[in-house]
Amino acid sequence: FDEVVVAVFINSTKQSLFTVEERIEMIKQTTSDLPNIKVDSWSGLTVDYCKQNNIDVITKGLRAVSDFDYELQQAQVNLQAGVDTMFMATDPAHSFLSSSLVKELAKYNGDISTMVPPSVQQALLKKTGGK
């Protein structure tokens, strides 16, 4: 892809540990060496964001079959609006990860160094009270 947009979506049904601004900053720090990355935020449907920004393809990582069931439904809805979805299999070493697991480990000083970039690790430890 010539340009990759990493969009932080505001989900009112989830309680995020970090603000949208904090999440955007962590993504920018993590991807600073990749010149074709654009970081943005959006409140609404992903497909509407794509249409408004002339994006034809959404890429999604899949950890397990349970991810695929949900994501396939979303992909079919998005395809009706003219936006395709490309699925990428997660590295098996990371297929068990979830944000709740990483937050729990950080809270109790578990080693998350192989699970998140260093800047995210620092932010998580600070936010959760870990050391």
Annotate each PLM feature.
Residues 1-131:
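Nucleotidyltransferase catalytic core that binds NTPs
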